């Protein structure tokens, strides 16, 4: 949860052409982790394998699949209508398509998330959602529907953290803000979130046609944040 385990599995966002089951993907990750040299323990090294292994721990502790836990503990309590584990996306819906804005034209270089990459990342890249549902999840992590405020504080202040990252977030401004940025290998998807920790103000950006660098994207979000509540948010 703090990416200080020393686990350093390479190629988690590259397709290996395997149609993994959830259990199969977790076992594959364990084998890769055991066969790969580790980084220094207790130093920060973000790696998707940490979250895949966490999905495996959830399976072991609950006796149910990670997907079943997501449905019973998150999707149902929050009444989410647009959040699915990849394999469970209804046939009546499609997962999003990403594009680039290039040479003055929209919708260039169309790209879906690669099926095999998604399936090898349970707990780290196989949950598909919308910005509005994702915001409801953020609220649920504080209002008692998923976690209480006290439990969220524990999650975001784990003793093993070595920087401001803990439990999926970077906490800034003395813990008043939570931030997360992400993209997905070989696609153009980019997500950025910056919220106050009480979830009352902020922004959730889900982009399927980004333009510019990571910092340029964040600057666009920050220009919006300044209008939401001036003097509250940070640039990056």
Indicate residue ranges for each PLM-predicted region.
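Short, surface-exposed beta-strand/loop micro-motifs that present aromatic residues
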Residues: 181, 189-197, 202
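Aromatic/pi-system hotspot detector in well-structured domains
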Residues: 51, 100-101, 195-197, 204
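A short acidic/small-residue loop/turn micro-motif
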Residues: 118, 210-211
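A short local loop/turn or secondary-structure capping micro-motif enriched for an aromatic residue
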Residues: 188-190, 211-214
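Structural recognition of the beta-strand scaffold that forms the well-ordered cores
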Residues: 45, 84, 194, 202-206
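Short, surface-exposed loop or secondary-structure junction motifs
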Residues: 1-179, 185
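Short, gly/Ser/Thr-rich active-site loops of penicillin-recognizing serine hydrolases
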Residues: 212-236
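Residue-level structural signal for beta-strand termini and adjacent loop
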Residues: 183, 207-208
